[in-house]
Amino acid sequence: MTTLHNLSYGNTPLHNERPEIASSQIVNQTLGQFRGESVQIVSGTLQSIADMAEEVTFVFSERKELSLDKRKLSDSQARVSDVEEQVNQYLSKVPELEQKQNVSELLSLLSNSPNISLSQLKAYLEGKSEEPSEQFKMLCGLRDALKGRPELAHLSHLVEQALVSMAEEQGETIVLGARITPEAYRESQSGVNPLQPLRDTYRDAVMGYQGIYAIWSDLQKRFPNGDIDSVILFLQKALSADLQSQQSGSGREKLGIVISDLQKLKEFGSVSDQVKGFWQFFSEGKTNGVRPF
């Protein structure tokens, strides 16, 4: 064992103030110098330092995971708030539709189904309305009605899940449906063109336009007894407003193509009506002896 010399008392050896450490306890020691004196670090100390380092690493890793989870939750809540704000902005312009959303009745029915699943809740909403923006609006109403109802905490949690799911998976679909609702509702008041097909046609034109033939086929299917010319005019006005709100980008170019195709369809529809009228004129024998062939 190294003898430490005290500068104040000459070379007198220092007396040991504690028993000698057994040789088995000082195995794998690390030697070094500290301020001119020999020091020893027992392997147990090294292990303690390693254990502390490992624990600190684990704690920081755990905090990082929690931070990511909180960030994801925060992003989801922000998305729900953004969609909700736009839905309220547009649907509030059509109070007639809001009156149909009897949240109290909906809450009463759902509170009697304690084991309802997320998919069942969505299916129930689809049964109340086929329009995603109205479904989302109903969920927001349910969420607000459930505040301060701890006995329905399971349902409140389910509604929050549904809101996050819809906002993330159908956000654009919901917002576009809400945005066009005031104009589509006014157009539907004539009793000729139904509200939901108007919303769906506009939404398809913005989100997934497939070309002039596809949109013509959709118009024929969705408005078999409607006034297709007025539907085309409705779409032209709505898309032109969207075009003016966009300064640049691929979205603006796509809207320009759709509007151009709609104009062609309008002209084609006019010619088609003339041909039908011409054919009916001949088939009824109103041609002074000239008969249809």
UniProtKB/Swiss-Prot annotation:
SUPFAM superfamilies: Type III secretion system domain. The keyword Membrane applies. It is found in: Cell outer membrane. It comes from the Bacteria. Its main location: membrane. Keywords: Calcium, Cell outer membrane, Membrane, Plasmid, Virulence. The keyword Calcium applies. Belongs to the HrpJ/YopN family. Plays a major role in regulation of the low-calcium response. Seems to sense the calcium concentration and to transmit a signal to shut off yop transcription when the calcium concentration is high. This is Outer membrane protein YopN.
